[in-house]
Amino acid sequence: MDIKGDWKKRAVCGLMVLAMALSLLPTSILAADTRSVTENAIKNGSFEEPAFHDKNSPQWPANNVPDWDTTASDQLIEFGSRRNGKDAPQLTGVDKTIPDGSQFAELNADEESTLYQYATTVGGNVYEWGLSHRGREGVDHMALIIGPKQNFDPAKPSEDGRDQFMRMTDWVSQHASGMADMGCTQKITVYSKKFAKNGRFENDIGDAFSASPSDVYTEKWNVWIIGTSNTAWGNYGTKSSAYAAGNLAYSCRYAVPDGQTKTVFAFCSYSAATSDKTLGNLIDNI
């Protein structure tokens, strides 16, 4: 993915409901082109916990949702299920199959935010991701961001503020070329300053991101932008039929740097079909 300063196109960043089946499969490098899968890194990836049953509200406090966290100021993670009438998308005449189990999560509930999880990783291993994504009101785009756990958790300075990952997607939208309306981009590499408190970065003056590493931009991130319509789930990475056939058009691998024992997997809105920031992309089966 080329990074160009003259790329100015920006999709309206909004809510994404993301139904994604994202498998993160670490592969130990044994020899050239020889890898062995060891375990799933992401937990509660199907968002089956906590179970809905007869709960009317689709929102759960993050501390009640195993393994996941959010940067939302209200600390709520929004779930969907046919049991609470929150089918996704809420349209007639389209397939409403849920990729795995009976629940999924909504990336943004009442505000734009990032849904994320820390995984224990082994330096030198390569992890592969796979996900199923779907728009809600039309074509929605999400960002998948993988990189090193920081000394400070990602955070928003206010309800309408931008956390570090959201700021990263803003930068990508201004500097990356080759963004497709549908499907998944090639892997984009971004370097940033270290995270600080309240959505800020260390020495948070000037640009927080760069296309190249330096003594200032020390944190390396891999970013993928994925766009899908609301008519059917789109399968990406290891969930794609192209992956099974051995002809995936992009890399779905993340190489863990030596010594990196904690890795963050973050999911945030890149753009949505409507201007309503409480509607967007579905996530499931990670």
Question: Residue spans of the language-model regions?
Answer:
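Hydrophobic core
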Residues: M16-L24
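Sec-dependent signal peptide cleavage junction
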Residues: L24-S36
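Extracellular glycan-recognition surfaces and repeat-rich motifs
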Residues: S46-Q103
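Extracellular carbohydrate recognition and processing domains
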Residues: E159-Q260
